[in-house]
Structures are given as C-alpha cells and as structure tokens.
C-alpha cells in the first residue's frame, strides 16, 4: 500500500528521518558524557577530592601537594589516592618540534584508576623522586602513539626529549583511556617537584582522585575528609583555616557544565520527535479513513480488528525503518559537521566530543526509537478505525463524513503539535536573546586585529631557578628579543604577552594582604593575578584609568609594583579612597615583597564574557620572570592578523628554531570558540532548528486538518450556502475551526513553557526564563501562521457550488 501512495510515503519518511536523525545526533553526544561507563575498573568507586576557598577571587578545584600527602596517609575511606596536574611541554626527537599538553602524575595514578598499559609497563615507585631536572620516563596515549609515531610496536624504550630532557617511553595507554577533567593530554609523566613545590601548602594546583575502600561509601569519605580538613586547619591555620574540602563522584566531573545543556537539547529533540509522530499520525489517520471501505469489507469477510491494527502497525514500522535509515545518514552528516566546526581548544575543553560516533549503544537507541515511533503514530489510527462498527463505516462513507471521535483525535494531534512548537520557539527565542546579550558585552579590550598564540619554552635552554623567587632570565631575554623583532614585522602595530588570556576560563589566583589591614592567618582572600609585560595594556587597548602603566624599568632591580582593575578597587576600597600608593603582598612565600599599586586599569572579562570581571592584580613579568616560561603572546596588526603568522613564526625561529606555537588564531576566533559563547551559540542553533522544523510541521498539520475538514464537509457547506449563507460566513466558520485549535495549542504550550524554561535559567544571560517579550511574540507568530494556514483551505470552501455539491452527495 505504501508504494501506491508515494507522496504520502515520502512526506512521512522525510518527517521521521529529520526527527530520528536529530535524536540520534544528540544521543551520540549524551551517551559518552552522561551514560557510558567510565573506562576504569569499578569506576563507580572513583571520586574527585579538591579544595576551594569561599571568599572572593578565583577558586580552583585543586589541592596543595602537602595536603594531598596528608590525605593519602590519613584517610581510611580510600583504598588509594593519586594526583595529577597539566603542563605544556615541547617534544623533540620525532620530527619537527611540537608543543603538547602533558599530565604529571603520582606513580600510583594509573593503578588507582585501574588502568593497565596496553604496551609496556606502568610507572614504578621512585620514578617521581624530585632529584634531577625532570621526568625520565613517559607513557603515551593510544591516539598520540598512532598519530605521531605511526603505531610503531617497537616504541617501548625509544627516547624522545621533553623540554630538552631525554625521556624514555615505557608504556602505551589503552585505546579507550580518557580522563575528561584533564582534557586532551597525549603524554603522561611522573610528577617531579622542587623543594618549594613539595612544601607549599598554600599553593593549590594538584587535582586529586581517590578510590573508595571496600565497604566505604561516598558519605563516609566526605565525613572523614571534613574531619581531616578540620585537623589540618588547626595545625596549619595560615594555609588551611579557610579551606573547604569537596568529595564527589568522578562521573560528575566528566559532565561538568554541559550536563544541563545536553539534557535540555535531549528534551528539545524528544519534543521534535513527538511533533513528527503527531504529524505522521495525522497523515496515517487521513489515509486510513480513505481506506475505511476496504477495512469494512475485510471485516465483513472475517478479518479481526487485531489483524487490521497489526497491518497498520506493520506499515508504520516500515515507515519508521525507512525514516531511521535516512535519519542515521542525517545524524552522520550532523556529527561530521560538529567535528569540523570544533577547534582543538574546544576539544581540549570538551574532549568527550572525540568519542561522538554511531556506536553500538547509539544504534541500539535508534532501534528503540524506531519501534517507539512506529507505535506512537501507528497505534492510534489503527485503533480508531478498527473500533468503528461496520455499519458506521458504511454510513460515514455514504455521507462522506467522519466520526466525532476521529475528528477529536485529529484535532488533539494538531493541538499537540502547536503546543510543542510553542515550547521550542520560546526556548529558541530565549537562547537567541541570550546569545545576542553575550555578543553585545564589552570585553574590556578591543579584540579586532589581534593575533594570539602560546609559546612554551623548554626547560633545557630556559631553566627555572630552583629556589624562590624562581626566576628565568633566559625566558625573559627571549620574550624581550621576540617582541622587539615583532616590531619590525610589516603590519604589526604592537606586541605583548600575558600569563593568561582574557575570556579563557583560565584564572590564576594568589592569596594576598593589603598593608595596614589585619588579617588572621588563613583568612587571606584570593585574587585573580596576571603577569604581563610593559606593552600589554597598550596592545590590548585596555585603558589605564588612573596612575600609570608598566614600563621596562619595572624589572627585577626596580621597586616592586602592581596594577589593579576597577573591580578590585570597588571591592577593597569601597569607601572611595584612592588605591594608588597602597601596597599589597602575595602570601605564597614569606619572602614575597610588598608591591606598590601604581595604576588602575579598566575591567576585563578574564573568566568569560557572561561573568563579571573579577578583582584582578597585574604584575610586571619582568619582576617575576618565571612566568615567562609559558607565555601567551598578543600582537595587534593593521590588517588580517592571521596573514602575518608566517612572519611571526620566522621571528621566533630566528631566536630559537626548536620552538613551536600552540593555538595560533585571531582573538575574534578565540573568543567565538570560548565556552562562554560556544555553549550558548550552539544550543541556539540546534534548538532554533528544531523550533523551525516544529513550526513547519505544525503549520502543515493545521493546513491538512482544515483541508480535510473542508473536503469532508462539502455537503454541509453546500446546504448552508443553498439556505443563504454568505461566502464570508463560510470563510469565518472554517477559519474559526483552525483558530480554535491554534489558540488551544498556544495556551497549552505557554503553560508548558512556563514550567520547562525554568530548566534553562542557568544557561541564559541577560534575559529571564519568563521573558514577557518572548512569551508575547511567539503566540502572535503562531496565531498569524495559523490564520494563513486556515485561510487557504477556507478560501477554497467558499468556492463550492451548492448545486454541484448536493448533486455529488
């Protein structure tokens, strides 16, 4: 029967393909993030343990190394506790120099996770001893081994150089190994610390993972860690008095901030599937009504009602299977487009997107959706027809009409389509306003014509001093020479560098005190800190509001100085007193000097565009040259910033040919790919697409309903007109039928929207979840479209010739 009506079949299959494809694409992301078991032994026993401070400033979900050692020796709720931290390294000895992000781990890290190398061996106790200039062994991830070493099975024992230090590859990690909170880290080495780092209890940088002991629960671990934390606060009030310890499932860290986003998208595509089912159900109902004489005859010849329902369900299943096959193709295209649109930086932020594919669980999901879809849109029409007595079928056939129950079912399906369309359009409208609000924000600097990239200087030729203040004169010398050379590159207007880029969600914090203000040990507040060179503010076009900026005279031999932003002044000098001349001191080391505040600069979106600028302190990198080892350079150009990249590379390689650039891109691209914009723009694109599709389907459904109603009421319309009804009366009568359904659907949709949009509140910026403008525009838009969709068939109804209609009847 499906081949006899190719138009019906094509419309139904395409509708289902779009809906099933969207559900498949989103589920292929949801599965690796929220549902797939972590690739570790007994992953439900793995937890993250971290420290944070509740006062203003940046608070990292990380621990200090001394606290980690205390936890490891004291906590009985854990079978083992391990730590890791990320860093950037330059690898040589395998082609061109390449900067990669690597992880430094305690030697029990992989045994804690329950991971065994697929080739080679694990790290051994003692390989993380602090003696020497760095790690001597390393393990590679499967993907890095495959991409950079050609899956060479003889890789074990090979020596490469990390930051100029020879390192022996001792193992290859399993193919499915991935620690999402750490990002994409292709190289793993044992942790090596200098004496200061091992003793710095106030320095929080180590991410900690624990494996619960047999019989221990998460709550028991939390209670025990709180008790240990209280003891440490009493023993070390200067560093631990204001520290809070958090213990949570490792799975929670995997999803992070994207969990609510994925759930909302999954709900959106689910609603889209319901609309598709309602639309196809209406098509099936219309088609089954046209076949009612066939069903009546078959029933009279002995066919049971169950047999008729099964036949319609089989036809529905065939439609669903065809839709699923096309949907899989559509989902594959969608996944390919997603992969193409993501930058390496975004994949580092959300590395689980590397696992988005049509895996077996995803295929199983498609199978389940296919069967469910067939039942949803095939069962109702089948039951509606099979439950009608033969006499009613023949009577309705002779009158050309349909039963009230069938009309109510068709109306209910259209109302459901309109209601769901309202929900999706409201969600899309809120996301649109949120994206526009974020894009209109002033980041505090001018991103146009800026080129940015990271250079990591290898430890060999650029050694960091082993004692405080950990200076790196070679790194500082490179930075100055590089910036001076950039000044001679055609098209370069200015060049500078910073320890951290704005809008990067990479806040670096230090505890500090203001001179003359009594602060109890451990009660110091944390503040976002950036180390920058003297040309940073002019290059970025960040205004100096009061005082002065930095100069190259602000070096290691000069008076220690600092700049602060307006947010810092408002928080620490709320009485309006001038902050210039005040002195502050970082408390990370007793030897840290007081720094005089010499200027106040404008606020910059350091965290993300949608977050208020945090109180920030800027320190000249010339006075803390250790931070020049990993430095983000920013170059302002007179034209396209990416066009000068070859000349910029040449300037760097003229100084050191073994340096590599990381994440070289324009600042505009960097900001557009930042989580603040990306995690709002993509949901808007997706939800907006679903909303438009839902609107089209609902419009088609309403148009089809009124058209079918007109065709079934030809005799009634003819009688009305024969009795004197004017064409305007017929027009209003027919349009009113569509408007009643539309209004009902809009009201139901608005009620649902009021409830469901609360789930989106955390994703919105600059707009409330119950924004009155959105809740006004969407109903007006839908009602306007409903009038148009109803007018066309209603207009056709007014052209009925009463005599011809009565004669045909």
Q: Which residues fall in each region the model found?
A:
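Alpha-helical transmembrane segments of integral membrane proteins
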Residues: 1-9, 250-255, 283-310, 314, ...
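Membrane-helix entry/capping segments
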Residues: 1-11, 40-41, 96-99, 130-131, ...
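Small-residue-rich transmembrane alpha-helices
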Residues: 28-29, 281, 317-393, 433, ...
């Amino acid at each position: 029967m499906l081949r006899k009506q190719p138009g019906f079949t094509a419309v139904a299959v395409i509708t289902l393909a779009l809906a099933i494809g969207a559900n498949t694409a989103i589920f292929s992301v949801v599965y690796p993030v929220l549902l797939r078991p972590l690739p570790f032994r007994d992953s439900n026993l793995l937890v993250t343990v971290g420290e944070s401070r509740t006062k203003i400033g940046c608070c990292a979900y990380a621990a200090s190394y001394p606290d980690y050692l205390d936890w490891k020796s004291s906590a009985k709720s854990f079978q083992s506790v391990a730590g890791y931290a990320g860093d950037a390294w330059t690898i040589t000895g395998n082609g061109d120099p390449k900067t990669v992000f690597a992880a430094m781990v305690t030697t029990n890290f992989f045994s804690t996770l329950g991971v065994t190398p697929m080739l080679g061996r694990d790290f051994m106790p003692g390989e993380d001893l602090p003696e020497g200039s760095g790690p001597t062994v390393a393990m590679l991830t499967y993907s890095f081994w495959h991409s950079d070493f050609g899956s060479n099975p003889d890789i074990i024992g090979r020596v490469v150089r990390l930051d100029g230090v020879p390192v022996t590859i001792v193992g290859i990690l399993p193919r499915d190994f991935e620690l999402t909170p750490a990002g994409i880290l292709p190289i793993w080495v044992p942790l090596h610390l200098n004496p200061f780092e091992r003793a710095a209890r106030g320095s929080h940088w180590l991410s900690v993972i624990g494996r619960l002991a047999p019989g221990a629960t998460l709550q028991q671990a939390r209670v025990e860690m709180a008790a240990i934390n209280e003891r440490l606060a009493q023993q070390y009030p200067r560093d631990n008095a204001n520290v809070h310890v958090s213990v949570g499932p490792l799975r929670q860290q995997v999803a992070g901030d994207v969990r609510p986003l994925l759930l909302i998208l999954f709900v959106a595509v689910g609603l889209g599937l319901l609309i598709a089912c309602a639309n196809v159900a209406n098509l099936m109902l219309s088609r089954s009504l046209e076949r009612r004489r066939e069903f009546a005859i078959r029933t009279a010849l002995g066919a049971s009602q169950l047999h008729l329902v099964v036949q319609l369900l089989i036809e529905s299943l065939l439609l669903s299977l065809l839709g699923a096959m096309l949907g899989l193709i559509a989902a594959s295209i969608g996944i390919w487009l997603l992969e193409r649109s993501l930058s390496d930086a975004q994949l580092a932020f959300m590395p689980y997107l590397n696992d988005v594919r049509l895996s077996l669980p995803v295929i199983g999901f498609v199978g389940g959706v296919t069967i469910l879809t067939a039942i949803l849109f095939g069962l109702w029409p089948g039951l509606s027809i099979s439950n009608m007595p033969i006499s009613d079928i023949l009577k309705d056939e002779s009158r050309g009409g349909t039963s009230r129950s069938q009309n109510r079912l068709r109306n209910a399906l259209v109302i459901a389509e309109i209601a769901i369309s309202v929900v999706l359009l409201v969600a899309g409208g809120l996301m649109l306003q949120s994206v526009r609000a974020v894009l209109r924000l002033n980041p505090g600097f001018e991103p146009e014509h800026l080129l940015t990239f990271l250079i990591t200087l290898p430890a060999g030729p650029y050694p960091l001093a082993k004692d405080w203040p950990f200076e790196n004169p070679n790194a500082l010398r490179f930075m100055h020479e590089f910036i001076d050379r950039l000044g001679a590159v055609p098209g370069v207007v200015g060049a500078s560098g910073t320890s951290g880029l704005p809008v990067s969600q990479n806040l670096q914090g230090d505890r500090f005190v203001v001179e003359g203000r009594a602060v109890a040990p451990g009660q110091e507040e944390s503040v976002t800190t950036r180390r920058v060179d003297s040309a940073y503010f002019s290059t970025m076009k960040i205004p100096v509001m009061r005082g002065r900026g930095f100069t190259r005279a602000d070096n290691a031999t000069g008076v220690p100085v600092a700049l602060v932003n307006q947010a810092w002044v408002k928080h620490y000098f709320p009485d309006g007193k001038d902050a210039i001349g005040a002195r502050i001191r970082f408390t990370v080391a007793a030897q840290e000097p007081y720094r005089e505040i010499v200027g106040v600069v404008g606020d910059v979106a350091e965290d993300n565009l949608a977050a208020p600028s945090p109180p920030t302190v800027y320190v000249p990198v010339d006075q803390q040259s250790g931070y020049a080892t990993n430095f983000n350079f920013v170059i302002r150009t007179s034209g396209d910033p990416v066009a000068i990249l070859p000349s910029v590379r040449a300037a760097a390689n003229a100084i050191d040919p073994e340096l590599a650039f990381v994440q070289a891109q324009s600042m505009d691209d960097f900001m557009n790919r930042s989580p603040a914009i990306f995690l709002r723009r993509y949901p808007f694109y997706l939800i907006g697409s679903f909303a438009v599709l839902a609107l089209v389907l609902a419009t088609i459904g309403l148009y089809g309903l009124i058209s079918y109603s007109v065709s079934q009421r030809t005799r009634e319309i003819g009688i009305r007109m024969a009795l004197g009804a004017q064409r305007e009366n017929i027009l209003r009568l027919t349009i009113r039928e569509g408007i009643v359904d539309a209004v009902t659907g809009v009201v139901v949709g608005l009620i649902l929207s009021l409830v469901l949009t609360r789930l989106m509140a955390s994703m919105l910026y600059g707009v409330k979840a119950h924004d009155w403008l959105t809740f006004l525009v969407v109903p007006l838009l839908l009602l306007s479209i409903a009038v148009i969709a109803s007018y066309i068939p209603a207009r056709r109804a007014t052209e009925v010739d009463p005599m011809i209609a009565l004669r045909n009847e």
